């Protein structure tokens, strides 16, 4: 069964809040994800905050959700979110709340958090929104637990994200939850972005943790390592991929990532091993071969070192 992502397009919608997550999901579908994207609105014709008319699509009341589907709520201009038209739309608010209670996951991008808060969904829930609106969100809805200076939050099937670009980060995070970190990496690479995480995450994927730099040669090497982790790693070969001498490559790699090449390879192997261990059909020797190790003993040693640290 496909996981459905239904975007609720409100009047004065912010186009980037809509387009960023939608395109990210589309790229995931192109890579084979069993996702389905749908759209609904509140009026016959919605006009975006930038003046783009969006012709009639399905009214939200016509949408039927399944447990595990996602309701995506892009941000809209505050003039609409503070309007009587929105505040008095009890049909919309009751619909959103009922969907959440049925097991649908709700996800707001930017000022879309005000919609969830108006429905009461964010009561006693950690959440965030655009940095210019966090104080306003907390003041208007004092039961919320607004978090500052983070990209996104996740609690009890409720996802909220900060500014425009963080909607892409949140969508990549959801894709990773559903399809795994390597699949999310492929989508991020297709979009020419590298995933970032919020400070509340207990565990950050090592596929992305050391990508907070702009050196194209080092990114190219990191891509190669991730995609070829089952192969033997040769420092000279990696330096060639980066287009550098070995000495210069090892120096620049550590400067840009904050970690040595060998330690980075080890981190990627650990993460891959943890993913493979979830598959009961894979033997330890098979797992070893999948991450470029020679034996089950090497796998155990690697994971024991990880626990000791």
Predicted feature locations:
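Extended, subdomain-level signal for the structured scaffold at the beginning of enzyme domains
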Residues: 1-106, 115-117, 176, 185, ...
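Basic phosphate/pyrophosphate-binding loop/patch that engages nucleotide-derived ligands
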Residues: 120-121, 180
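Predominant activation on well-ordered alpha-helical scaffold segments within soluble catalytic domains
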Residues: 19-22, 138, 169-172
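A conserved active-site-flanking secondary-structure segment within enzyme catalytic domains
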Residues: 122-150
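A short beta-strand/loop micro-motif in the catalytic core of glycosyltransferases
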Residues: 106-107, 127
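Acidic/polar active-site rim loop that often engages polyanionic ligands
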Residues: 115-120, 168
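Conserved anion/nucleotide-ligand pocket segment
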Residues: 150, 154-192
């Amino acid at each position: 069964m496909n996981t459905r992502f239904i975007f609720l397009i409100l009047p004065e919608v912010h186009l980037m809040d809509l387009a960023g997550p939608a395109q990210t999901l589309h790229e995931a579908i192109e890579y084979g994800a069993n996702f389905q994207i749908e759209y609904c609105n509140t009026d016959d014709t919605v006009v975006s905050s930038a003046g783009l008319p969006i012709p009639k699509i399905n009214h939200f009341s016509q949408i039927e959700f399944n447990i595990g589907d996602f309701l995506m709520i892009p941000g809209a201009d505050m003039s609409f979110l503070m309007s009587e038209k929105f505040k008095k739309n009890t049909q919309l608010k009751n619909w959103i709340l009922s969907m959440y209670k049925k097991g649908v996951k709700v996800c707001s991008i930017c000022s879309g958090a005000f919609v969830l808060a108006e429905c009461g969904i964010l009561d006693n829930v950690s959440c965030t929104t655009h940095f210019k609106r966090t104080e306003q969100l907390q003041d208007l809805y004092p039961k919320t637990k607004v978090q500052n200076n983070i990209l996104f939050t996740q609690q009890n099937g409720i996802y909220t994200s900060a500014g425009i670009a963080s909607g892409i980060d949140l969508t990549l995070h959801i894709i990773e939850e559903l399809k795994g970190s390597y699949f999310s990496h492929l989508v991020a690479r297709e979009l020419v972005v590298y995933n970032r995480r919020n400070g509340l995450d207990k565990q950050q994927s090592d596929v992305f943790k050391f990508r907070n730099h702009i050196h194209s040669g080092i990114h190219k090497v990191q891509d190669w390592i991730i995609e070829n982790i089952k192969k033997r790693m040769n420092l000279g070969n990696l330096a060639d991929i980066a287009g550098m001498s070995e000495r210069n490559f090892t120096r620049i790699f550590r400067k840009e990532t904050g970690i040595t090449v060998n330690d980075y390879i080890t981190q990627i192997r650990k993460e891959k091993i943890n993913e493979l261990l979830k598959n009961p059909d894979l033997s330890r020797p098979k797992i070893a071969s999948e991450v470029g190790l020679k034996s089950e003993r090497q796998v155990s040693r690697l994971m024991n070192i990880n626990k000791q640290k």
